[in-house]
């Protein structure tokens, strides 16, 4: 279907305006003086800025397009995103403020930094960093996929989609390199306001356009597709999958490097705590998005590509102006999270692989430059991977959730378990990753989310093996800050 020139022009104007704001956000040279300034804004962001930043970070184009696609094909299974995010914020309320305090005191900018200092182990920090980077690349690729799909629908017949996508991501890489976290933070405000306005507009107008209201729409859905409103009791995505997927996704949410980056920008633990209370408001948007998937199921032809369901629904329902604002919102929901993810991945690579393993005596100025420069490598890899393996992206991202949750014991559990040892934690992490991938490859999940099997193996290994190594456990400033000083501890003990 031919694109709409008016919609394409509006999309381009909004996106380019936001990119310019991203560059302007970094006009103050202080944003590039250190890794801490560039990646977490010197930890000076108030509660409202953090709310916009983390919201932009976690609710991406993949959230909107992916949830609509899931609702379009699987019905109510898509609602797993609601309990998982509510549960995630409930859990985060208890551990994120403690983690923020440790990061603030010891000037940590990544979760791998915390693992290194908490356990005196560069090995564990490197594992956390490797998992974080490898799992994040496909997630960045999905943002590429989101803007590519948007431009494909909006610009068919007018532009070379791949060329424009590449240019868009180069611009994002440039403003991220230049402005650091300040770029996506200030542009996130625009993106999030657009998300709320456009989604509310769509959820009110679409039922009126196609069914004369919500009640007739629900009645039509009940009559024509009642299976869309129930969760299967068994099968590969039955109730056990729904429950375990919600639990694993909740535990994994703040293990992602970009989520931790957003949290570490806060100016106080109280700001982090308040965000855990108010971030669930974004679930209102998620509920609306799922119902848009139901509307798409009723309105669009059966052979519609589920991935493009929301975009085609917009295309067939609105004129050029409304299409333009909707497409721009989805495009920004691709580009802005991509920037934050690139910062998170670059930080992990530069701090926890380059500095910790390759060049431990690197100067702060050079480390800052290396960290900033890695943005181009990360986004370049994501572009390359997305172009070469487009069909593997969703699978890899879903597997990424199962992989990321395996660092939960090393990060969140260790904030509360004083005698947790690095040896048991490393073995548990490796066991969890191995079990997750074996279950996935052999397709032996038995209706349970793959990451749940891995996390179970991980925790069992840590609990069983920890007593074997606890006598070797030392102390350090992080442990003393969390649990108080330990008598007879050897603070100079170093790990692998």
From Swiss-Prot:
Per the record, membrane topology reads:
Multi-pass membrane protein
What does the record say about induction?
Negatively regulated by TnrA under nitrogen-limited conditions.
GO cellular component terms attached to this protein's record: plasma membrane
MF terms in GO: transmembrane transporter activity
Segments spanning the bilayer are 5-25, 45-65, 77-97, 127-147, 161-181, 193-213, 239-259, 278-298, 325-345, 374-394, 396-416, 424-444, 450-470
Q: Where in the cell is it found?
A: Cell membrane
Pfam families assigned to the protein according to its UniProt record, in alphabetical order: SSF
Ligase found in the keyword field: no
Instruction: Show the CDD domains listed in the entry.
Output: SLC5sbd
UniProt keyword terms in alphabetical order: Cell membrane, Membrane, Transmembrane, Transmembrane helix, Transport
Q: Sorted alphabetically, which InterPro entries does this protein's record hold? A: Na/Glc_symporter_sf, Na/solute_symporter, Sodium:Solute_Symporter
Q: Which GO terms describe its biological process?
A: transmembrane transport
Which cysteines in this chain are paired by disulphide bridges?
none
**Superkingdom of origin organism:** Bacteria
Q: Which family does it belong to?
A: Belongs to the sodium:solute symporter (SSF) (TC 2.A.21) family.
What name has this protein been given in UniProt? Uncharacterized symporter YodF
Organism of origin: Bacillus subtilis (strain 168)
